[in-house]
Amino acid sequence: MAVQQNKPTRSKRGMRRSHDALTTATLSVDKASGETHLRHHITADGFYRGRKVIG
């Protein structure tokens, strides 16, 4: 089993954690219905970029 030889510094710990931050989902408002949805995804009622694509 690998065991560290020296205690990692606070700086190294912070550098390792630098990529762990969470980001909020980017939302868009549909042109046709005014509904909020995830970017590059269709809305719940089937619109994408102002066009009806499903149903």
Curated annotation (Swiss-Prot):
Report which residue ranges the record marks as coiled coil: none
Query: Where is the region Disordered?
Result: 1-28
InterPro entries the UniProt entry points to: Ribosomal_bL32 (IPR002677), Ribosomal_bL32_bact (IPR044957), Ribosomal_zn-bd (IPR011332)
GO MF annotations, alphabetized:
structural constituent of ribosome
What keywords would UniProt list here? Ribonucleoprotein, Ribosomal protein
Q: A GO BP term, please?
A: translation
What's any one GO cellular component for it? large ribosomal subunit
Q: Which Pfam families match?
A: Ribosomal_L32p
Instruction: Provide the family line.
Output: Belongs to the bacterial ribosomal protein bL32 family.
Name of the protein this chain belongs to: Large ribosomal subunit protein bL32
Gene of this entry: rpmF
